[in-house]
Amino acid sequence: TKWNFEANGDAYAPIVDKIGNVYFVDKGGKSLYAVSKDGQLKWKFASESAPTYCFPVLDDKGNIYFGNGTGRIYAIDSSNGEELWHMDSEGTDNNAKIMSGMTIGDNQMLYVSYIGGNVAAIKIFAGPEKSTWSCRGGNIHGTNQY
């Protein structure tokens, strides 16, 4: 093992940038971590009080996006861990939870699925502006891990 980093809770969904930095969320600590390619903590961003299960995603400008169990979506600067913006999803606690991954399309849209059966498309470089649509059957969760 080259290095080992211990988070405050269950570590989920590591992603790696072009220079080898690793970013991951931890459920118990409700945080997003940045760890250097040699295993040293670069920064830690603590989200609100909800557990964080969502796979983060990195855009071509170096911004990281992730969500938590309340449906809040964060945009974080990967160089320093500072919050760029956040937005709250619409809906009740049950159908607004973000329990899976996100993806970024070629059109610079962030696509997010919610446990209540909705998928949102959010313009990420112009600030949060979204359109939402429902999926028959509901409960879109675990798309990247189940």
Regions found by a protein language model. Give the residues of each.
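Extracytoplasmic/lumenal domain signature
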Residues: T1-Y146
